[in-house]
Amino acid sequence: MAKGGFPGMGGGNMNNLIKQAQKFQKQMEDMQKEIENKEFTATVGGGAVSATVSGKKEITEIKIKPEVVDPDDVEMLQDLILSACNEALKKAEEETSGEMKKLTGGLNIPGL
């Protein structure tokens, strides 16, 4: 076996592979921090309800226009809130997936 490596591979190749893996890990950490600091907002019902989520996928704000608060139709308001939250979470997920694809060159790496 070659010194510092695997059969058929020079020791320098292994060092390069380790450096590339460390660089990739740093890029992923930087991207994750960047996304965690972003906010994603979705508005539904013609502007009646909006929800904002962080890149950590935590709901940070919900805005409801007073005119949509109808005590006789609470179910509609609940549906609007759910829709706004789900849409904002979807935006956050799409952004995360898009950035990950850029970083991995489109490779689908399980667990990332």
UniProtKB/Swiss-Prot annotation:
Belongs to the YbaB/EbfC family. It comes from Clostridium acetobutylicum (strain ATCC 824 / DSM 792 / JCM 1419 / IAM 19013 / LMG 5710 / NBRC 13948 / NRRL B-527 / VKM B-1787 / 2291 / W). Homodimer. This is Nucleoid-associated protein CA_C0126. Its main location: cytoplasm. Binds to DNA and alters its conformation. May be involved in regulation of gene expression, nucleoid organization and DNA protection. Residues 93-102 have a biased composition (Basic and acidic residues). Keywords: Cytoplasm, DNA-binding. One of its GO terms (cellular component) is bacterial nucleoid. Residues 93-112 are annotated as: Disordered. NCBIfam families: DNA_YbaB_EbfC. InterPro entries: YbaB-like_sf, YbaB/EbfC. GO terms for molecular function: DNA binding. It is found in: Cytoplasm, Nucleoid.
